[in-house]
Amino acid sequence: METATVLSIFISSLLLGITGYSIYTAFGPASKDLRDPFEEHEE
């Protein structure tokens, strides 16, 4: 394969991995531990 093909596949999979991890962090089981600064600062 050409270098450009390998590089584009690598960058695409890296972006997909980061997106998947951020969605899992935001909505997965670990989201219960996240703090919400807007709820802490209600008056």
Curated annotation (Swiss-Prot):
It is a single-pass membrane protein. It is found in: Plastid, Chloroplast thylakoid membrane. One of its GO terms (biological process) is photosynthesis. InterPro entries: PSII_PsbN. The keyword Transmembrane helix applies. The chain crosses the membrane at residues 5-27. It comes from the Eukaryota. One of its GO terms (cellular component) is chloroplast thylakoid membrane. Keywords: Chloroplast, Membrane, Plastid, Thylakoid, Transmembrane, Transmembrane helix. May play a role in photosystem I and II biogenesis. NCBIfam families: PRK13183.1 (NF009650). Belongs to the PsbN family. This is Protein PsbN. It comes from Porphyra purpurea (Red seaweed). The gene is psbN.
